Amino acid sequence: MNSKKDKKKSKTTTKQTHLTTTYKGVLDIAKSGMGFIIVQGLEQDILVFPTDFNTALKGDEVRVKITKIRQGSGKKEGKVMEIVKRKQVSFSGTMQIMQHHAFFLPNTIHPMPDIYIPMDKLKGAKTGDKVIVQLTKWENSNKKPEGEVLEIFTPEKENDMAMKSIVAESGFPLVFDGEVLAFAKTLSDKISPDEIVKRKDYRKVLTFTIDPLDAKDFDDAISFQHLDNGHIEIGVHIADVSHFVQPGTAVDKAAYERATSVYLPDRVYPMLPERISNELCSLRPKEEKLTFSATFEVDATGKIVHTWYGKTVIFSDRRFTYEDVQTIIETKEGDHQDEILWLHDYTQNLRKKRFENGAINFSSQEVRFTLDANGKPIGITVKESKASHQLIEELMLKANQLIAEKMGNVKVKKEVLPFPYRVHDQPNEDKLNPFVVFAKKHGYPFNIDSPDHIAHSFNNLMLASKGKPEQHVLEQLGIRTMAKAVYTTNNIGHYGLGFEHYCHFTSPIRRYPDVLVHRIVQSVLMGNVMNDEGLEEKCTHCSMRERAAMEAERAANKYKQVEFMRDYLGHSFEGIISGVASFGFFVETVEHKCEGLVTIASLSKFDDFRLIEADYALVGSRSGRKFNMGDKVVVKVAAANLDKRQLDFEWEVNGMLNKKD
């Protein structure tokens, strides 16, 4: 009975316990077609065969039933029982049209069925056309999914299709449905006297906005007034989105689904319809607007001696751009110069104290694109954080902190009020240790004895490396050691900012958590405290949508960088090695911040290179030549693949060749 056959059979014996267990998770699909359900809290993913997807697609939130538990490994196999929420309903791809029927072939590297398109839903699409299609029906996996053409792209719309594809792949709807737009149209822009008497009136207090030159929505304004006691009151006034977006309405559901606006180089996919974001809630100059405000009274020493929170009505006297305010700060001249200069001094002091108290001063670089009429990039610059940006940043941080502190002290039946905090955990030790070794090799001491020591070490390192070749690499590696900031009702503080209490209150036009915060704060002020039992689930959803938006924004930036570099094929650039791996090293160009890969294969003509992980370096086995993180190199643009959003570089051993000015 101990035959090899019996032994083999015993290894695959299925444990038949707990097979009624179901889990909720997210479906990931490998290139092979196999599925894996990622469940929060489970150490191992649940394996699902393609025949058990039950119409689920990559990224869908699903409910899965366990069908088998493998003996020995304990690995679970399952079957999708229900699709809780589809990640993506719009897809980019190509049309294939027959005599009596048509199919849409999705542009994806992951296995996905073709979508049947009824002939009356083609909207004029022809075979070979690049289109966006919306999934409208898929009753069961024995039938083809059904959809309709949303948009047809001509060659000159290549950029438009790419941006829409990125947004759709990230699970964000491309348009608002008719019900949402119709609801938004019904909202009145008239402010009634009855509404004004319910609010604190700031219409006669000096108020202004400071925003980018091309901003279309202004969701925050600052007021400034001298009080009779000699103190100064600063008001942070935020568009009162929750007044217009009531829970359970069509527009609220659409906003929650998105949870955030998505900002791409040439467009914005807003969380709210433009009727709300760009009109009703935009704090435009010379218009009365409804706001939700946090004000703080500051004495002669800069100490906050009193705070107030509540609904207000304002009248913005002036719209400043960041450039306007920066000019006033530098020249000491301009409209409302006294107020601007006082706020500049005050916020620089806030900033200084914040870093002294443990905040970390990472200065990540943000690229900006100059685009032609068709959306093609013709220039890339790096956005600078100047004093004018810091003025607004510090006031917003202070308002968010004060609101969170206030709500942290509210009790409901002797229990802490559930509240959507913005939290940031301490660095991961496994990620931190290699970074510390790398920093010390470059001559930068690093103390990891406590969280405070870590924060101060990061700040000292950033200061000491400023202007040096390795600065950007150290910043990027340092950021990678950090945990991701998330929304949760479990307040563990915000390590990166050095705050014990923090939330997002100041951008409800573009972030749904801010809407949740406004509603809860108002319920506390009204004495009818909102205790949302589903709040943690909403926090998790908002965190996931935020990550998806960031991935879309990174993908769009990468697309634009690759598109820009197509015009520079064969040209050489100075760069900094920004990453090393067994398959090559990544280089970021100094001039344009475009990152590409120098493959190990392209280096083989020089030497046989191997990765030394502890050194973050590739080392030649014969020559000993090292490519270290942070090294300056010269690279030639070898390939620019728009479909994959990838740049290939080749190392230039002899320096700058064919450099294009």
State where each predicted segment sits.
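Electropositive polyanion-binding surfaces
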Residues: T21-Y23, K137-E139, P155, N159, ...
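Charge-lined substrate channels and their catalytic hotspots, especially those that engage the 3′ end
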Residues: M1-E233, S242-E288, A617-S623, N628
